[in-house]
Amino acid sequence: MHIGHGHFFQNLDGRPDHEVWRTEMALADRAERLGFASVWAVEHHFAGYSMSTDPLQFLTWVAGRTHRVKLGTMVSVLPCTTPSDWPSTPACLTTSLVDV
C-alpha cells in the first residue's frame, strides 16, 4: 500500500507566512521517518487560504532532506509559469522520485 502525505499550505487563521511554512516543513521532515511513501504539494494562486505558489520550490527543499520518499505535485498551474522553463525544474531534482 502506498500512502502519501499532502501539503496544502493553508492559512485559515491568519498566521504569519513564516509560521505556515515552518509547520509544513516540520510535517515534511516527519513524513519519511513515519513511513509515508511520498510527499505531495499543491500550487494555488490568488487564494487567501493557501500560500503555495511554487510546489517545486518546496519539493526541492524536501528532496534535500529525504532519501526514499517520492515527490509529487498535486496541482501545477502551467499558465502561471513559463512553459519552456517548467520541465527543467523537476528534471533537476531526480529521475526516479518525482511525479508531476
Stretch-by-stretch model annotation:
Residues 1-73:
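N-terminal beta1-alpha1-beta2 module of alpha/beta enzyme domains
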Residues 2-19, 80-100:
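Flexible, glycine-rich active-site loops centered on histidine and acidic residues
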